[in-house]
Amino acid sequence: MPSMPEEPILTPTPDRFCMFPIQYPQIWEMYKKAEASFWTAEEVDLSQDNRDWENSLTNDERHFIKHVLAFFAASDGIVLENLSTRFMSDVQISEARAFYGFQIAIENIHSEMYSLLLDTYIKDNKERDHLFRAIETIPCVTKKAEWAMKWINGSQSFAERIVAFACVEGIFFSGSFCSIFWLKKRGLMPGLTFSNELISRDEGLHCDFACLIYSLLRTKLDEDRLKAIVCDAVEIEREFVCDALPCALVGMNRELMSQYIEFVADRLLAALGCAKVYGVSNPFDWMELISLQGKTNFFEKRVGEYQKASIMSSVHGNAAFNDDHVFKLDEDF
C-alpha cells in the first residue's frame, strides 16, 4: 500500500511556538476577522424579551425557543471539547492555533449567552435544569449530540473530522438560526434575535475556517465519503427541525425548511470543493438579507458589521484572503 503524503499543517515543527513570520496569510486574516468580531453577553439587552416572552409568544413558540436554546447551550460545549481535546493538538501551525484559541473564547461567550437566555426566560428551576441538561433529557438533542461526539471520540482521519465539525457549525445550527431570524422578521424578541445574529455570524466564520483548513490538506476525502458525511448531517438536522421540534410551531413551512437545509448543505459542499447534491434554491428570500457573515441588519440596531475596524484595517493589503473559502447564504446558484 502506498504511503500517505505528509500533511504540513499536521506535522510538528519548532515554528509552531512563534507566531511570526506568517506562513499562511489566509489563516491569519481569518484569525484577525475573529478578533475584530469579539463581543460579550453583557452587550445584549434582554429587557424587552421578557415582555415579548410573556405577552407576544404562543405556547408553541415558547416551546420551540426553549428547546432550540437547550440544543445551542449543549452544542457549544461539544464544539469546545472538540477544539480543546482534538483540533488544538492536531493542527501544528501557529496561525490556526491562534484562530482556535480565539474560537474557544467565543464559543464560551455563546454558551454563556444561551445559558443567560434560558435563565432569563425560564422561571421554574426544575424546568430550567431539565433544559440545561438537554443532552441527557431531550431525545432529539441527544441524537444530534451523539452524532457530533462520535467525531471527537473516534479514530477517523483529520479530514473526516474537520468536515464533520463544519457540518455541526454549518448545518446543525442552520434550521434553528433560520427559525430565530423568522421571529426577528416579525419584530419579536430583540435580545434573542440580536444575539442570534452575532452568533450566526461567528459560526459562519468558524465554518469558513474549517473549509479553509480542509482546502490545505494534501489528502482529501473522496467525493462519495465527503457527501455521505454532509448528507447524514442533513438528515439529522431535517429530522430535528422538521419533525422532532417542528418549525411549524413558529409558523414556518416544513417543506421550505427542509429545502433550506438542503440549500445550506449545497453551499457547504461547494465551499469544500465538492459538487452540490440537492440543486435547490434558497426558499427564504429574507434570509438572503442576513448571510452567515452578518452583512446586514433588518432594524436600526448595530450588529451585522459589528467588529473592531482598526483590527481589520491592519491586515488588508498584506494578507491574501481568497473568497473561495467563504461559506455564505446570499449567493446565486
From Swiss-Prot:
Tissues where the protein occurs: Expressed in roots, rosette leaves, stems and flowers.
Matching Pfam families: Ribonuc_red_sm
Main localization category: cytoplasm
GO biological process: deoxyribonucleotide biosynthetic process
Active site: 114
Known EC number: 1.17.4.1
Consequence of gene disruption: No visible phenotype, due to the redundancy with RNR2A and TSO2. Rnr2a and rnr2b double mutants have no visible phenotype.
UniProtKB keywords: Cytoplasm, Deoxyribonucleotide synthesis, Iron, Metal-binding, Oxidoreductase
Binding residue positions for Fe cation 2: 107, 169, 203, 206
UniProt cross-references to InterPro entries, sorted A to Z: Ferritin-like_SF, RNR-like, RNR_small, RNR_small_AS, RNR_small_fam
Any one Gene Ontology molecular-function term assigned to this protein's record: ribonucleoside-diphosphate reductase activity, thioredoxin disulfide as acceptor
Cellular component GO terms held in the UniProt record: cytoplasm
Stored PROSITE patterns: RIBORED_SMALL (PS00368)
Domain of life: Eukaryota
Catalytic activity from the UniProt record: a 2'-deoxyribonucleoside 5'-diphosphate + [thioredoxin]-disulfide + H2O = a ribonucleoside 5'-diphosphate + [thioredoxin]-dithiol
Reported cofactor(s): Fe cation
Coiled-coil intervals: none
Compartments, record wording: Cytoplasm
Function noted in UniProt: Provides the precursors necessary for DNA synthesis. Catalyzes the biosynthesis of deoxyribonucleotides from the corresponding ribonucleotides.
Family that this chain belongs to: Belongs to the ribonucleoside diphosphate reductase small chain family.
Subunit field text: Heterodimer of a large and a small chain.
Name listed for the protein in its UniProt record: Ribonucleoside-diphosphate reductase small chain B
Gene source species: Arabidopsis thaliana (Mouse-ear cress)
Gene (UniProt): RNR2B
